[in-house]
Amino acid sequence: MELHGASAADISRQLVTKQISAKEVVRYFLERMARLDAGLNAFVHVNGELSLRQAEQVDNHRARGDALGPLAGVPIAIKDLLCTTDMPTTCGSRFCAGYMSPYDGTVIAKMRAAGMPWLGKTNLDEFAMGGSTETSIFGATRNPWDVERTSGGSSGGSAACVAAGLAPLAIGTDTGGSIRQPAAFCGVSGFKPTYGCVSRYGVVAYASSLDQVGPMAHTVEDLALAMDVISGHDPLDSTSLPRATPGYEARLSQAPHRFRVGVVREQIENEGLNPEVRAAIVSALSVLKECGGEVREISLPHSKSWVPAYYVIAPCEASSNLSRFDGAHFGFR
């Protein structure tokens, strides 16, 4: 049995047809983590007994013929920025060392209700404020393809564990690239949803007007399955969009419609753009054309101000969000 290269959708199909049990799936990944993660440092908290207990509950429901969602029994790794009642939430910081949340974040509660066992919490830059997963109190996370290179950040642990086959799915957060960049560095798929599509309740804030929770996986189909679980309106998040989950996975099976892709001239012609990155973008655009897409060049002259604007907004909001910790006594002082 080799599951480390399987997609979440493949594992789901094997679970539904009872070729394998949820407990066997979780045990497989726990054993693989025990062998390989010491050299990667993708996980910072693991509770094998909890993971197996969650998997056993799914197996019991399936044995009784209870209705289950498509990801029931498919394990997932969680960035250590989301509040969980049964594992520490440390944000990669000594300040929060040993902190146990009294409540689950909304995304966590949705995954729990969907029957998804969690394999553990993954490494990140401290408070998600970085792009290399090197500023964590737990040490740096290594890139599975070359341990001398960075996994990216701040969701580097989530990207690395999927790339290394330690988990079929992972949850990250993205403020200024923290899902997309490590996914690219580690060769997996990552998705930052539109702001408000996924609840931020129970996510330790970095920059509140930019933060979003999103999935990381081997395939786009897996991302869609995960989005069907974690997205949707949440009254506990004032920025949550008041609309139902659109059915991401169902849309993948629909006949493709024509679509337009805008290529920002100022970005593709930027002197600072690495030639290899430019070549990869051009190659991707060719694939999109083959899929029926209309590629159109557009001009956004203000794009030169994007990064400076980010470095005004994000640090200001981060300063405000971190100030709420002042006077609290969780970890080291």
Identify the meaning behind each predicted range.
Residues Y103-H233:
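Short glycine/serine-rich loop segments
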Residues P70-K110:
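Enzymes and membrane/adaptor proteins characterized by extended Gly/Ser/Thr/Asp/Glu-rich
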Residues A22-V26, E56-D59, G247-A250, L273-L300, ...:
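Acyltransferase
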Residues I11-T17, A77, F95-M100, D211-H218:
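Short, well-ordered beta-strand elements within core beta-sheets of diverse protein domains
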Residues K192-A279, S283:
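A short helix-breaking turn/cap at a secondary-structure junction
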Residues M1-L52, E290-G292:
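An N-terminal boundary/leader segment
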Residues D10-R13, T17, N123, E269, ...:
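Serine-dependent amide/ester hydrolase catalytic core
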